[in-house]
């Protein structure tokens, strides 16, 4: 009969080394996730922690407090989470709450629903103890006032970097999360792909996961993240799956889309990859506790 000490050693040997891939250059996100994983926390806990770190950073204008507002000067936030069991939660058009990713987690864990929006999402958040907070910082307000002078339409490539993260934990389970302030100076009420399961994020623990950033309207049209995962199910590796999903968009625009979309993906084996339409796409990968900033060149660059 094996000793308890040997049994514990066997468990450690059977554990996987966690893997993290996050859109853009959000080092605080990966660092927060690593802290959770170092304590053998779940991929879902790590993904939530990653997004919370970005949401709490006032100097970041892309998510949480300090996000650039809509055309009316109001900060509206979107987020979603999906775990290794296929459970998911989402909030959209949420105002005055710093951590929409945690509200999305509460929707998943504490309700029978998947998505809450607007005033209903805010009421739910407050009922769960989240505090009403002014999200419009001095910097984001000044940027909005400057934009007001000419009201030139901005593009997501100019102003908007969604934080999306995909994580595989020590048990081999994959979860993901997205959080964003959305398209800067958008129409009041606009919601993009980030809170939509299958568009901004999708996880199938038997296959892998994918997430998106860029022009959300175009990601929604193609159910982008779901498509990437389905391509991996068919045998594509993460990079090839992201590339094929983008090639379908390129084809639908006669080879010349005038916007940016980027995908990240992770396979059940812990392999990660990314691809983008234009320019370049920075992203962070953490393996064996070491985080490296990577960049891929756009397919049309």
Q: Language-model segments: which ranges?
A:
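Alpha/propeptide regions of enzymes that mature by internal proteolysis
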Residues: 2-301
